[in-house]
Amino acid sequence: MSYASAALATYANMLGTLDHLVRKASEHAKGEALLQARMAEDMLPLHTQIRFTVAQVNVALDRLGSIGLTLDESEITSFADARARIAAARELVAATDPASWPASDATVEFDVPNGMGFAMQAHEYCRDWATPQFYFHLMSVYSILRMEGLAIGKADYLGYIMKYLRQPAA
């Protein structure tokens, strides 16, 4: 399996998880107020964690697929807005051909807002930058929602795994 195929499958699965978590949050008694929740005072709120989770996918697809994507950096203002952005990212992932990504040893160069610049091979970018960034923000979403009292657990986080279920267990 190519690094591109692995990354796209991961994004497809885990964007599904993000959508599931956001849907459950939208049904919670605290409502839209949850969007302002944060784990610690110096951490970003839920709405930003959701936006950054989606942005990690979009940025990776743009850097590796050269699709010329313009990021929506506006704040998420509602769960409906969050779900629409997740849906758009899922559609983009589904439409991406892994063969359009560069060779695994192609150089990817990028700068981050604090002024640091990086250069690494495409597979290293995917493995060492894009994937950890994606999971960091996704786990922050999950953790904030747990902290706020949502009844979620591992089955909610790994719901996509049910497509591999076989019965009865051996």
Where in the sequence are the language-model features?
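A solvent-exposed interaction/effector surface
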Residues: 74, 102-103, 108-111, 155, ...
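C-terminal or internal capping secondary-structure element at the end of a domain, subdomain, or sheet
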Residues: 123, 127-168
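Basic/polar N-terminal segments that are highly enriched at the extreme N-terminus
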Residues: 1-8, 20-26, 162-170
